[in-house]
């Protein structure tokens, strides 16, 4: 059985309208697929500035939709959404329990795969709330380590993750061969 995070509500002042509104954080359901897909598309578009190899069509592809459906419905996946008073999704976090790399010590691993908060809702600890709930879910699943990938140039995200307690661990490097002079 999939451990659940209880829905929670909080009042938030929208930067754009300066009005207070109630936000609700809850686990995603299959009914949220289109809203999560749209947020994921926005995340990819935002991340493209750091990584031009991002496939901006992936979210809408069959593989992208299959991935999101599995994360929402399977017990090894975690997708939490935040909705505003109009029932629009304004944030989400997706993560999953992952297999231990064979070269790592025996332990239980999870990966934070994606997180986004709409710009008008940033700065109100929504991302921290989502991450806190993911950590709680990981503890319920007896996870020892959570990892994530972040673009090395994405300073705001790196600062956010470090504030939570994440530390740099592995370094992935890439060489784009088309940029090398031909021999």
Summary of predicted features, one role per range:
Residues 128, 152-170, 181:
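Conserved active-site alpha-helix within GNAT-family acetyltransferase domains
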Residues 44-68:
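Conserved GNAT-fold acetyl-CoA-binding loop/helix
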């Amino acid at each position: 059985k999939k451990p659940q995070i209880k829905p929670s509500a909080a009042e938030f002042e929208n930067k754009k309208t300066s009005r207070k509104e109630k936000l609700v954080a809850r686990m995603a359901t299959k009914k949220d697929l289109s809203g999560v897909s749209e947020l994921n598309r926005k995340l990819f578009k935002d991340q493209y500035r750091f990584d031009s190899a991002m496939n901006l069509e992936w979210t809408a592809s069959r593989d992208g939709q299959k991935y999101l459906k599995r994360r929402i419905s399977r017990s090894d996946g975690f997708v939490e959404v935040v909705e505003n008073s109009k029932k629009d999704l304004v944030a989400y976090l997706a993560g999953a329990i992952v297999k231990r790399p064979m070269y790592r010590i025996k332990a239980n691993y999870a990966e934070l795969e994606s997180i986004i908060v709409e710009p008008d809702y940033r700065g109100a600890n929504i991302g921290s709330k989502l991450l806190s709930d993911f950590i709680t879910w990981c503890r319920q699943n007896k996870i020892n380590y959570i990892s994530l990938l972040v673009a090395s140039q994405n300073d705001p995200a790196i600062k956010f993750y470090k504030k939570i307690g994440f530390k740099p661990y592995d370094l992935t490097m890439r060489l784009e061969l088309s940029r090398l002079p031909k021999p």
